[in-house]
Regions:
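Vicinal oxygen chelate
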Residues: 17-27, 57-61, 75-102, 114-121
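Short acidic/polar active-site loop segments enriched in Thr and Asp
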Residues: 18, 107, 124
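Short secondary-structure junctions
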Residues: 40-49, 103-111
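Conserved short beta-strand elements that form part of the metal-binding/catalytic scaffold
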Residues: 42-81, 125-131
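A generic structural signal for short, solvent-exposed coil/turn residues
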Residues: 12-14, 36, 50-51, 61-63, ...
C-alpha cells in the first residue's frame, strides 16, 4: 500500500512479471537446451552478458514470457525436486505437455496442488496450468 495522501487511501498495483531468471550448474547446459527446445518447443539461445562469465541460455516461450538461465558452479543441483520456487507454465493442454516431458525422460513430481508437475535437470520444478 502506498502512503496516504490528503486522507485518501492510495494503492499501487503490483504484478508478477513474465521474465524469470534461474541458476544452473554448467554441466546442465546441454540438457537444459534440449529440455526447452525439443520437449517444450521453446528453443534456448545463448546470450552474452557483461560481467557474467559464461553465456546464459534465454528461452522465449511462444505464448509469452522468457526464462534466463545463468550458469555457475555454485548453483543448487539435485536429482530430487528442489524445494524452492516452482515455476508455472501455461498450455492449452497441460496433460499433453506433461506427457511430452515424461516421454523425453523428465521426472514427474507429485504434489496435491494439481496433477501437472515435472522437474528439469538440476531439480527446478515446473507446474503446467491451463491457459483458460
Amino acid at each position: 500500500m502506498a502512503p496516504r495522501s490528503a486522507g485518501k487511501a492510495s494503492y499501487v498495483v503490483i504484478a508478477l512479471g513474465s521474465n524469470v531468471h534461474i541458476f544452473a550448474r554448467p554441466h546442465r547446459r546441454g540438457e537444459l537446451a534440449q529440455c526447452f527446445g525439443t520437449v517444450l518447443g521453446s528453443p534456448a539461445r545463448a546470450v552474452e552478458f557483461p560481467g557474467i562469465d559464461q553465456p546464459m541460455l534465454v528461452v522465449s516461450f511462444p505464448g509469452g514470457g522468457h526464462l534466463s538461465i545463468e550458469f555457475t558452479d555454485e548453483a543448487p543441483d539435485d536429482e530430487q525436486p528442489r524445494l524452492g520456487a516452482w515455476l508455472e507454465l501455461r498450455a492449452d493442454d497441460p496433460a499433453a505437455v506433461l506427457q511430452a516431458a515424461l516421454e523425453a525422460g523428465l521426472t514427474e513430481v507429485k504434489h496435491p496442488g494439481h496433477p501437472y508437475y515435472f522437474m528439469i535437470p538440476g531439480g527446478q520444478v515446473f507446474t503446467i496450468a491451463p491457459t483458460s
